[in-house]
């Protein structure tokens, strides 16, 4: 089970939001690259970046901070980024800068043809981010709820050739209420590509619950507020997850 620290970027700083509300941002560090180094030193094997300003503006807004993070740790572990990615030129630029994965969310839902083009042009580097509430997909920084069922879109995008799917339960994100295991497993069973869980991770119990269903196709989990607030010790959690996997394999 891959534990992936999230670095959410707003106005060049590392922040956390509650339920995607830009007005409820807590600043955790003014230098995101320093935060990235911290998580790598604590044992992170991948980083998850979100350009929050970009997600709402529909175009990149924190490129300097993103490049600084890539320069700091991109040569050591894969870095993935979502938020404000709406065209192939932006994807190409980010991949050239050293990103390993680009996450397409709203643009994939609103313009599936763009996602197909991206998967065709940059195979192996495109992740789809599906954000949902009560099984329905949300777009535009979670501000708009669509009528699309998560599983239906996931299967469609899998056929396009995306690398994996990040599934975020909007109702739980930033609330430390626990991962929605049932909904995550349901989605993982609907597709053959890996699913990464997101939204609500709160403690070791969540990690253990995810490890129990890892073989359903759940590759990892995004770690947000819990590792910043101290509710979850990231290094200890990743070590614990690795040990659980080793015991299962024994």
UniProtKB/Swiss-Prot annotation:
Any one Gene Ontology molecular-function term assigned to this protein's record: 1-(5-phosphoribosyl)-5-[(5-phosphoribosylamino)methylideneamino]imidazole-4-carboxamide isomerase activity
Entry annotated with the keyword Isomerase: yes
Protein name: 1-(5-phosphoribosyl)-5-[(5-phosphoribosylamino)methylideneamino] imidazole-4-carboxamide isomerase
Pathway: Amino-acid biosynthesis; L-histidine biosynthesis; L-histidine from 5-phospho-alpha-D-ribose 1-diphosphate: step 4/9
Isomerase recorded as keyword: yes
Source domain of life: Bacteria
Organism taxonomic ancestry: Bacteria, Pseudomonadati, Pseudomonadota, Betaproteobacteria, Burkholderiales
Single GO cellular component term: cytoplasm
Keywords per UniProt: Amino-acid biosynthesis, Cytoplasm, Histidine biosynthesis, Isomerase
Pfam families, A to Z: His_biosynth
Active site per the UniProt annotation: 8 (proton acceptor), 131 (proton donor)
NCBIfam families: 1-(5-phosphoribosyl)-5-[(5-phosphoribosylamino)methylideneamino]imidazole-4-carboxamide isomerase, PRK13585.1
Compartments reported by the entry: Cytoplasm
This enzyme's EC code(s): 5.3.1.16
Catalytic activity, reaction form: 1-(5-phospho-beta-D-ribosyl)-5-[(5-phospho-beta-D-ribosylamino)methylideneamino]imidazole-4-carboxamide = 5-[(5-phospho-1-deoxy-D-ribulos-1-ylimino)methylamino]-1-(5-phospho-beta-D-ribosyl)imidazole-4-carboxamide
Gene Ontology BP terms: L-histidine biosynthetic process; L-tryptophan biosynthetic process
Signal sequence residues: none
Family: Belongs to the HisA/HisF family.
HAMAP family reported in the protein's UniProt record: HisA
